[in-house]
Amino acid sequence: MANRFTSSDQTQETHGHHVDKHSFSGRQRHPSMGVHSFNEYMNEYPEAGPLVQEEEDDMESSSYHATQEDIGDDDSRSESTRNRSSQHTGRVNFSSLGGLGSIFGGKKSRSKSANGTQKKNANNNEEQLDEEEQNDPYLDRDISLLGSTI
């Protein structure tokens, strides 16, 4: 069988790019062929946008490395630092394990049934939670922190 393309038909110039008819046919690449480089991905999916870290995030991460004397001395803080710390970021940082323990440390009441399997003691569970809430010194703080993120 004779080749039906001549050498001049096998290649064509399209938008300044060399295109081989046998491999590309001048059409868009089929999605199942996969993306082989980041530039191809960005050309194929421009809605992905650039991967750029925001300046605010950069400034927040550098503030974690502050020394204790910088934290204690309010006069040495710059105006931009004060403004940034007063802005609400929507994040809640728990600095103590006590704060996390008061939220996640609740113990569930369980009792063994006659056949030896465990089940919740539903009758005493609500009463026990009320007593724990009254004795929890961190409850008010936790509720106020969670309320500010909503």
Swiss-Prot record:
Localisation per UniProt entry: Cytoplasm; Nucleus
Compositional bias segments (type: Basic and acidic residues): 12-23
Keyword S-adenosyl-L-methionine set for record: no
Sequence segments annotated as region (Disordered): 1-150
Biological process terms in GO annotation: meiotic cell cycle
Gene Ontology cellular-component annotations: cytosol; nucleus
Top-level taxon of the source organism: Eukaryota
Key words of the record: Cytoplasm, Meiosis, Nucleus
Biased composition, class Polar residues, residue ranges: 1-11, 83-93
Function: Has a role in meiosis.
Protein name, entry field: Meiotically up-regulated gene 108 protein
Organism: Schizosaccharomyces pombe (strain 972 / ATCC 24843) (Fission yeast)
